[in-house]
């Protein structure tokens, strides 16, 4: 393995994503696992992060205090909950650390706090870190530019039963990509629920439908439907490792940035396509 270019800390290390982020960090060239964090009072405190993730001992033990590991990492990767993420964000700003944020479910104030913090430190904030999803977002922009003015646009997403926010952050990012390509504000054209007598579909709206069931990792479809034909652009994830690998890749890229707000399209250099 190459010498480490970036040392990462993983928040929520005991969760499903946390364990896969540990695996991804240990496997990726140029990356070293510097710290792994769990909540205060966890029974896993002091356990080896690698053994927790099933990769073997690493010498990195689980801790709950960021202050204790502040000299052990350059970039914090966080896929937890909004309230925890914002606390981590304040710490990273105070100690000049980069941050990769995969947490979803932020309100407008939370998003504004992330943008404001990015004026001081480098932040990658994305609803989805999969390469395929971010290519899909670019395809949606192109499709919307050609067909968006005259088709009915619907976004359908499905996730596992444990997901707590809806629509998913990825579905909202899809809506924002489409609305942006049409010079619209998603808030003004989104329809999130239909029930009872709804009347005919309002032209120019973007509909959302949500499924929560079983162990679905993540499925997203955008439909551009006209009379006589429709286009459907779909992404299906079968493993969370695709998100973990993308997030660690983002951390490696972020180490070279001084400050600023970025998403995965910046990391993958998709904005000029």
Curated annotation (Swiss-Prot):
GO terms for cellular component: cytosol. Keywords: Amino-acid biosynthesis, Cytoplasm, Diaminopimelate biosynthesis, Lysine biosynthesis, NAD, NADP, Oxidoreductase. NADP(+) binds at residue 39. The keyword Oxidoreductase applies. Signal peptide: none annotated. Its main location: cytoplasm. It comes from the Bacteria. It catalyses: (S)-2,3,4,5-tetrahydrodipicolinate + NAD(+) + H2O = (2S,4S)-4-hydroxy-2,3,4,5-tetrahydrodipicolinate + NADH + H(+); (S)-2,3,4,5-tetrahydrodipicolinate + NADP(+) + H2O = (2S,4S)-4-hydroxy-2,3,4,5-tetrahydrodipicolinate + NADPH + H(+). CDD domains: DHDPR_N. Disulfide bonds: none annotated. Transmembrane segments: none annotated. It is found in: Cytoplasm. NAD(+) binds at residues 12-17, 102-104, 126-129. Its EC number is 1.17.1.8. The active site is at residues 159, 163. HAMAP family: DapB. Catalyzes the conversion of 4-hydroxy-tetrahydrodipicolinate (HTPA) to tetrahydrodipicolinate. This is 4-hydroxy-tetrahydrodipicolinate reductase. It comes from Cronobacter sakazakii (strain ATCC BAA-894). The gene is dapB.
